[in-house]
């Protein structure tokens, strides 16, 4: 990724007054929860709920169940990217993440947050001295500013273009993503796999 330009979209781009909004969901690139183990524990379900406010801020709430009876670990490591490709001439869209909160009804949920050299925010969840051997549910919430790409160079629409889960090394048995907001959606699309070559089911309502 070095050597490419960066398109700074840190300023908020609101939804109010948009003629059309395209929602594009990607499920492989940078954002990747991993377990504290060589191989990630499989995920039984992963549900993501995103609410877009009028000022273009995305409020993310996600719940996932990890099965540590299959692969022992200490908890997930959420890797939240602060940039992704999509601009003109190889440029990156950049955005800000804030208000990260993680909880679990059954497992240790203390967090240790760092930022790597690529700018990804890494949130390590769990107790370093406790290994898990059962199924455990985790909930993570955070706010993303700058995900609305105005007049995207390819679609010429205002896009909510987001990598939902990233390069997750373990098995995900069920994944759902719901995006809601105050404006109509013109188009919706979803891709998964390496290089986003495999389409996944998507639908939209409101226009």
What are these regions (language model features)?
Residues 2-3, 8, 33-37:
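Terminal, compositionally biased non-globular sequences in eukaryotic proteins
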Residues 4-21:
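Bacterial N-terminal signal peptides that target proteins for export
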Residues 5, 25, 81-85:
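Charged, low-complexity surface segments at secondary-structure and domain boundaries
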Residues 7, 21-23, 41, 46:
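Residue-level marker of intrinsically disordered, low-complexity segments enriched
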Residues 19-31:
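Bacterial N-terminal signal peptides
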Residues 32-207:
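Lumenal/extracellular ectodomains and adaptor appendage modules
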């Amino acid at each position: 990724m070095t050597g490419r330009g960066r398109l700074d979209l840190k300023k908020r781009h609101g939804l109010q007054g948009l003629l059309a909004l395209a929602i594009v969901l990607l499920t492989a690139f940078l954002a990747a929860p991993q377990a504290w183990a060589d191989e990630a524990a499989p995920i039984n379900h992963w549900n993501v709920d995103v609410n877009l406010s009028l000022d273009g801020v995305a409020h993310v709430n996600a719940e996932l169940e990890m099965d540590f009876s299959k692969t022992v670990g200490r908890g997930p490591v959420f890797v939240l990217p602060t940039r992704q490709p999509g601009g003109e001439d190889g440029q990156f869209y950049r955005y800000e993440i804030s208000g990260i909160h993680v909880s679990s009804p059954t497992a240790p949920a203390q967090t240790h947050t760092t930022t790597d050299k690529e700018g990804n925010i890494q949130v390590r969840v769990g107790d370093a001295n406790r290994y898990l051997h059962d199924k455990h549910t985790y909930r993570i919430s955070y706010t993303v500013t700058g995900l609305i790409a105005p007049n995207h160079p390819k679609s010429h629409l205002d896009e909510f273009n987001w990598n939902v889960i990233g390069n997750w090394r373990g098995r995900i048995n069920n994944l759902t993503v719901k995006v809601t907001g105050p404006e109509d959606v013109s188009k919706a699309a979803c891709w998964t796999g390496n290089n986003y070559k495999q389409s996944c089911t998507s639908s939209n309502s409101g226009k």
